[in-house]
Curated annotation (Swiss-Prot):
This is Signal transduction histidine-protein kinase BaeS. The gene is baeS. Keywords: ATP-binding, Cell inner membrane, Cell membrane, Kinase, Membrane, Nucleotide-binding, Phosphoprotein, Stress response, Transferase, Transmembrane, Transmembrane helix, Two-component regulatory system. Residues 33-167 are periplasmic. Residues 1-11, 187-467 are cytoplasmic. Residues 247-461 form the Histidine kinase domain. PROSITE patterns: HAMP (PS50885), HIS_KIN (PS50109). SMART domains: HAMP, HATPase_c, HisKA. Gene3D superfamilies: 1.10.287.130, 6.10.340.10, Histidine kinase-like ATPase, C-terminal domain. It is found in: Cell inner membrane. Its main location: membrane. Residues 187-239 form the HAMP domain. One of its GO terms (biological process) is cellular response to cell envelope stress.
C-alpha cells in the first residue's frame, strides 16, 4: 500500500499551517479561559454591589420598622428591592433545575442571631460573601451570597454561549485565511526552488545554456546566481573540451600525415630507405612524442597530480642554470640572452617544477623571437611578492592575442605559429605551475617590441606561513 508522500511544497505548507493551527487553538483557549475567569469575576463584583445595595436598603427599612417582622414570610419585599436597581435582570426566567425565584439560591438575609429571614432552605455556605446590615453603627443582621463558581443566570449563560460560538467562528475563519496565506506563501517561497530544480534537470540532460533569473537578494537569489555561474562554467568547459579534441586531432594529423606519406613513398619505391629518410621519420616521431609528453604534463598539472616537493628555493641560481643551458641555442639563432638579477631571491616552491617553468618560458622566446633579437630576464621583489620578467623582442602580438596566450594549443598568426615547432601547450603548463605556487602569470607588450611574460610569486616566508 502506497502512502502519500508530500513534496517540499506540501511539507512546507503542512509545517506552516500546522504551526498556525496550534497557535490559533492555543490563543483561543487562552482567551476562553481568560474570558470565563474575567466574566465570573465580573459577576462576583456585581453580586458584591447588589449585596451592599440590599444591605443598605434593608438597614433603612429596619430603622423605620424597628424589627424584622416586616420581612418575615415576605420574600417578595426583598425581590422588589432587588428589582428596583436591577431592571434588566428582573425579567429573567430561572435556569434549568432552579426554583422559580432563582435569586434565592444566591442570597440569604439573616438577623443578628444568624436566623434565616429570607432565602432558600439550603445551608448557608461558610465561604459565602457576607455584608452586615448596620443601623446606627450596630449590626442587626446580614446579607449573605453563595460563592460564584459557575454561571447560573440565563442571561449570563446565553452571553457566554454566544461568545463561545463567536470565538469558534473566528477560529474557523482564521484557519481558512491561514490555509490560504500558507498556500500562497509556500508557492511564493518555493517558486525559485522549482525553477532551480527544472534548471538542474536541464543541466543533467546536457543543456548547459540553461539559466535562471534571480528574483530576490536572499539565499535563494544567491543560489540562483551560483547556479548560473555553474551553468556558465559547464558551458565553457564543454566548448573547451570540444576545442581541445579538435586541436589534438589537428596537431596529431600533421605529423601522422607526414609519416604516412614518407612510408608510402618508401613502399612505392618513390624514395629510397636512406639515413636521411630515417632522420626525417625520426623527426616526425619526435614531434609526436613531444606533443604526447606535453599533453601528459598538462593533464597532470590540470588535475594537480604533479608531485610538488616544496622547500625554500633561491630563484637566482635556478635562472642562471636555465639560461646557461639555452645560451648556446640562443647564440645559434643570433639572439642575445641578457640578465638583470639581484644576488638572491628565495621562494617556497618545487625546484624541478620551477626549472620546468623557466625552461618553457625560455623555449617560448627562443622559438618565436626573430633572429637578431634579444630576451631580457629581470627579477626583483615588491612588498611581499617576487616578480620575474621575461621580455623578448619582435614580433609582438595584439591586445586580443595577449589574453589568449595561456590557452592550450593557441598560437598567434605570423611568425609565432606552428612553423616554429611548438605544440601550443608550453604556456598553458606554465600557468598551471605558477598557480600551484599561489602565484600568477601575466602577458603584456614588451618594451623591446615583443611579448613580456611576468611571473609573480609570494616570498618564501609568506608561502611557508600559509603551508
Amino acid at each position: 500500500m502506497k502512502f502519500w508522500r508530500p513534496g517540499i511544497t506540501g511539507k512546507l505548507f503542512l509545517a506552516i499551517f500546522a504551526t498556525c493551527i496550534v497557535l490559533l487553538i492555543s490563543m483561543h483557549w487562552a482567551v476562553r479561559i481568560s474570558f470565563e475567569r474575567g466574566f465570573i469575576d465580573y459577576i462576583k463584583h456585581g453580586n458584591e454591589q447588589r449585596l451592599q445595595l440590599l444591605s443598605d436598603a434593608l438597614g433603612e427599612q429596619y430603622a423605620q420598622h424597628g424589627n424584622w417582622r416586616f420581612l418575615r414570610n415576605n420574600d417578595r419585599f426583598v425581590f422588589q428591592i432587588l428589582r428596583s436597581f436591577e431592571h434588566d435582570n428582573s425579567e429573567d426566567k430561572p435556569g434549568p433545575g432552579m426554583p422559580p425565584h432563582g435569586w434565592r439560591t444566591q442570597f440569604w438575609v439573616v438577623d443578628q442571631n444568624n436566623k434565616v429571614l429570607v432565602g432558600p432552605r439550603a445551608p448557608i455556605p461558610p465561604d459565602g460573601t457576607r455584608r452586615p446590615i448596620l443601623v446606627n453603627g450596630a449590626e442587626v443582621g446580614a446579607v449573605i451570597a453563595s460563592p460564584v463558581e459557575r454561571l447560573t443566570r440565563n442571561t449570563d449563560i446565553n452571553f457566554d454561549k454566544q461568545q463561545r460560538q463567536t470565538s469558534w467562528l473566528i477560529v474557523a475563519l482564521a484557519t481558512l485565511l491561514a490555509a490560504l496565506a500558507t498556500f500562497l506563501l509556500a508557492r511564493g517561497l518555493l517558486a525559485p526552488v522549482k525553477r532551480l530544480v527544472d534548471g538542474t534537470h536541464k543541466l543533467a540532460a546536457g543543456d548547459f545554456t540553461t539559466r535562471v533569473t534571480p528574483t530576490s537578494e536572499d539565499e535563494l537569489g544567491k543560489l540562483a546566481q551560483d547556479f548560473n555561474q555553474l551553468a556558465s562554467t559547464l558551458e565553457k568547459n564543454q566548448q573547451m573540451r570540444r576545442d581541445f579534441m579538435a586541436d589534438i586531432s589537428h596537431e596529431l594529423r600533421t605529423p601522422l600525415a607526414v609519416l604516412r606519406g614518407e612510408l608510402e613513398a618508401i613502399q612505392d619505391g618513390v624514395r629510397k630507405f636512406t639515413p636521411e629518410t630515417v632522420a626525417s621519420l625520426q623527426a616526425e616521431v619526435g614531434t609526436l612524442t613531444k606533443l604526447v609528453d606535453d599533453l601528459h604534463q598538462l593533464s597532470m598539472s590540470d588535475e594537480g597530480a604533479l608531485a610538488y616537493q616544496k622547500a625554500p628555493v633561491d630563484l637566482i641560481p635556478l635562472l642562471e642554470v636555465a639560461g646557461g643551458a639555452f645560451r648556446e641555442r640562443f647564440a645559434s639563432r643570433g639572439l642575445k640572452l641578457q640578465f638583470s638579477l639581484p644576488d638572491s631571491i628565495t621562494v617556497f616552491g618545487d625546484r624541478d617544477r620551477l626549472m620546468q617553468l623557466f625552461n618553457n618560458l625560455l623555449e617560448n622566446s627562443l622559438r618565436y623571437t626573430d633572429s637578431g633579437g634579444s630576451l631580457q630576464i629581470s627579477a626583483g621583489q615588491r612588498d611581499k611578492t617576487v616578480r620575474l620578467t621575461f621580455a623578448d623582442s619582435a614580433p609582438g602580438v595584439s591586445d586580443d592575442q595577449l589574453q589568449k596566450l595561456f590557452e592550450r594549443f593557441y598560437r598567434t598568426e605570423g611568425s609565432r605559429n606552428r612553423a616554429s615547432g611548438g605544440s601550443g601547450l608550453g604556456l598553458a603548463i606554465c600557468l598551471n605551475i605558477v598557480e600551484a605556487h599561489n602565484g600568477r602569470i601575466i602577458a603584456a607588450h614588451s618594451p623591446f617590441g615583443g611579448v613580456s611574460i611576468t611571473v609573480e610569486l609570494p616570498l618564501e616566508r609568506d608561502l611557508q606561513r600559509e603551508v
